[in-house]
A protein has these predicted regions:
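Positively charged n-region of N-terminal signal peptides that target proteins for export
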Residues: 1-4, 215
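Bacterial N-terminal signal peptides
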Residues: 5-16
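N-terminal, active-site-proximal structural segment of metallo-dependent hydrolase catalytic domains
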Residues: 18-121, 194-197, 284-287, 293, ...
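Metal-dependent phosphoester-hydrolase catalytic domains
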Residues: 19-22, 146-148, 198-211, 217-303
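Beta-strand-turn-beta hairpins that frame and shape the catalytic cleft
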Residues: 28-36, 131-134, 148-177, 303
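Active-site beta-strand/loop signature of hydrolases that rely on acidic residues for catalysis
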Residues: 36-41, 66-87, 127, 156, ...
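Solvent-exposed loop/turn segments at secondary-structure junctions
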Residues: 41-45, 80-84, 102-106, 132-134, ...
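Short acidic, glycine/proline-rich loop/turn micro-motifs
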Residues: 47-50, 177-182
Length: 303
């Protein structure tokens, strides 16, 4: 699909709810809606051949192609080894990259199902298009629960006239539904819940416009999800949350029809989201050649 302007691309996304790979476009002008994206880049390493998803120069070039086609203004990143790794995909001449300050963990070990490959550091961060005003707030280190192998949240504010607070997260994996006490992952995820809720409640109490986005490792849009119900309580006022996908089915992988990557908006942020602008980016490659095991998800908000 050819896109002749940012406006046309935005209108098409609002109608379709998903996006195939478009041609790369120029950044949006200051008055245009901002495209806010979350992308788990799957074990993105600094150097070729390392980590649980060892890559070649051609693989990094393919990721850059998709990053250009995505044409996002702000991208929350997950599973990125370092700033240097992110800058192999997001050109530092075009993007400011900020990564969590979490020290590299001691986890190491062999990648699951991949003998001889060693897991690398997984950090959360942002790539922010140059020209967008932003400030960094303290990382939400409490999400790690004192465990050096759990990820921190990264907290930035974009814009100045009508600022938006963004928290990028990558929550504990392995508890995508329910609350089984026999599953060792569920108690950890639910210990992260009050940390996340305190951040949300703090933003709502301060009257801020905020989003929480990233890899939640949880099907929070499922009917009656107990994790989401606990944070979506509208206490204090303004903490009434909305999930941007609005019940749409995921299409990145044939086996999985429910999202675990989410953009969650507070009530003030929802008023600035362009209706129908949620989209799941689709790679123009067979699933076994996808450059990551997650597809980016995006919305557009009024600046």
């Amino acid at each position: 699909m050819l896109k002749t302007s940012i406006t046309a691309f935005a209108l098409l996304a609002m109608v379709s709810g998903c996006a195939d790979v478009p041609q790369a476009t120029e950044p949006a002008p200051a008055s245009a809606p901002l495209k806010i994206t979350s992308w788990n880049v799957e074990h993105l390493a600094e150097r070729n051949g390392e980590g649980c998803r060892p890559r070649t120069d051609a693989d990094y070039a393919d990721l850059r192609r998709h990053a250009d086609a995505l044409a996002a203004d702000v991208i929350a990143l997950q599973e990125v080894e370092s700033k240097a790794a992110a800058e192999r995909v997001f050109d530092p001449a075009r993007y400011d990259v900020v990564m969590s300050a979490r020290p590299k963990g001691r986890r190491g070990g062999v990648c699951y199902g991949k003998p001889g490959q060693t897991i690398g550091h997984q950090a959360v961060g942002f790539a922010i298009r140059k020209g967008i005003r932003w400030t960094r707030n303290d990382d939400l280190s409490a999400l790690a629960l004192g465990n050096p192998d759990l990820r921190w949240g990264v907290d930035v504010t974009i814009g100045s006239r009508q600022p938006v607070r963004l928290l990028a997260v990558h929550l504990k994996s392995g508890c995508n539904s329910g609350r089984s006490q026999s599953d060792p992952d569920c108690p950890v995820l639910f210990d992260q819940l009050p940390v996340l809720e305190r951040w949300i409640d703090g933003r709502a109490a301060a009257g801020e416009t905020f989003l929480v986005l990233g890899d939640w490792n949880r099907r929070i849009a499922a009917r009656g999800d107990v994790f989401y119900a606990e944070i979506d309580d509208n206490e204090p006022a303004g903490a009434d949350l909305s999930i941007a996908s609005e019940g749409q089915a995921a299409g990145c992988k044939a086996r999985y029809r429910e999202f675990i990557d989410h953009i969650v908006l507070g009530s003030k942020a929802l008023t600035r989201m362009l209706p129908g602008s949620f989209e799941e980016y689709r790679y123009d490659q067979p699933e076994d050649r996808h450059p990551s095991d997650h597809c980016p998800v995006s919305i557009r908000i009024k600046p």
